[in-house]
């Protein structure tokens, strides 16, 4: 029984192989959104935006009003892992405080 080796191209000793350049692209970004509900106090939403998204009071209030009027509001734009972490932190905090506030992420 003969053992066959996989055929590979033969190169002369003077042959130089060029490395193919890989195009690097930035990571996909995700929007973190808060969804409106009829029970979560507006002040709690403002506090969440300040604590977890580093928004100043004025910006947090504007986002909260967008959530209230339009049904959802963008808290920020993050890479997938950071967005998922923020969604989990906000959701856990809201549940522990007894509020039904929903925080989700979607690809930007």
Swiss-Prot record:
Signal peptide: none annotated. It comes from the Bacteria. InterPro entries: ClpS, ClpS_core, Ribosomal_bL12_C/ClpS-like. SUPFAM superfamilies: ClpS-like. It holds the Pfam family ClpS. GO terms for biological process: protein catabolic process; proteolysis. Coiled coil: none annotated. Gene3D superfamilies: 3.30.1390.10. PANTHER family: ATP-DEPENDENT CLP PROTEASE ADAPTER PROTEIN CLPS, ATP-DEPENDENT CLP PROTEASE ADAPTER PROTEIN CLPS1, CHLOROPLASTIC. Binds to the N-terminal domain of the chaperone ClpA. Involved in the modulation of the specificity of the ClpAP-mediated ATP-dependent protein degradation. Belongs to the ClpS family. This is ATP-dependent Clp protease adapter protein ClpS. The lineage of its organism: Bacteria, Pseudomonadati, Pseudomonadota, Betaproteobacteria, Burkholderiales.
